[in-house]
Amino acid sequence: VWAYVNRFGTMRPYTYRVKATARGRVYSLPINLHTINQFFGTAMGSAEARAFVAAKAEQRDETASFEDYGLALVGRELYEAFLDGYTRKQWGLDPAELPASILKRLPLRFSYDDRYHDHRFQAIPAGGYTAIVQAMLDHPRIEVRLSTELRRDDPYDHIVWTGPIDAYFGFEHGRLGYRTLDFRHELHDGDVQGCVVMNYCDADVPHTRITEHKHFAPWETHDLTVTTTEFSRAAGAGDVPYYPIRLVREKAQLREYVARARAVTGVTFVGRLGTYRYLDMDVTIKEALDAAAVIRAGLADGTPIPAFVVDPLA
């Protein structure tokens, strides 16, 4: 993946770090040794903090729900301060109704490592993501058509569908549930929040986070700054679908669509929308490369090309 993206532009080293405002104070995220000492007003070392948090952890079935996993992981005080309110706003649901897998994506560290990700390679395109995508599409065998409706009876050798899987089948089993985002962009002088992202954990604050974009490129200098405030809500028919909900009802619908997809030929479903899964960027690129290899091999030797390279139900 790293070698692939570097073919299309210069990547600048960048470490994504997030701060959080909770109960009127600013903390380090994801929850780490600094967060714990900040929150409890202590100066514990790693081993002491690990034992301290373990003593506060509740005995819960960690697989039952987001809430159960969170309380079993960090105890009620840290859970209610940093996880409960933010999650209610982001998903519009009680955390007791959400799967534990959502929280398992975030680390708990007993060190002062406040990186949001611990991947080996962490960077951002020096010229922005638009330039990277433009370079990917700049190929003599690629034709880009905008505002073009797909008709399934058109004579394509094979379709790679990255749109919503339910939309491909005309929503015949109903619309899959998504959360969408509303953005409020503002222009300011100077520097507003001093960091790239500030999460707002309290449930009574309507927005989930504020992004100050110039901090994504610390090698640049700007007198002005743009902030974007995010508000999460249920996605409607005309909204951009961001986060698949994947609760019991949605999983039942998804099974119907997956069965439908596997019964047709000439199309492969990929990506967040095509497989109705929450995917990070590196995973998305890896799955796209894998799908391309499978499709190319199938077209070359005439073997059946699967509807999915990765099982959406796994």
What are these regions (language model features)?
Residues 2-23, 78-81:
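A short alpha-helix-loop-beta-strand transition element characteristic
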Residues 7, 139, 294, 298:
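Active-site catalytic microenvironments for nucleophilic, acid-base chemistry
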Residues 12, 143-147, 268:
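General small-molecule cofactor/ligand-binding pocket signal
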Residues 20-158, 162-167:
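Active-site/ligand-binding neighborhood in enzyme catalytic cores
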Residues 22-24, 30-31, 212-214, 229-233, ...:
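Pocket-edge structural micro-motifs
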Residues 148-260:
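Mid-domain catalytic core of redox enzymes
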Residues 174-187, 196, 253-314:
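C-terminal lid/capping helical subdomain adjacent to the catalytic/cofactor pocket in oxidative enzymes
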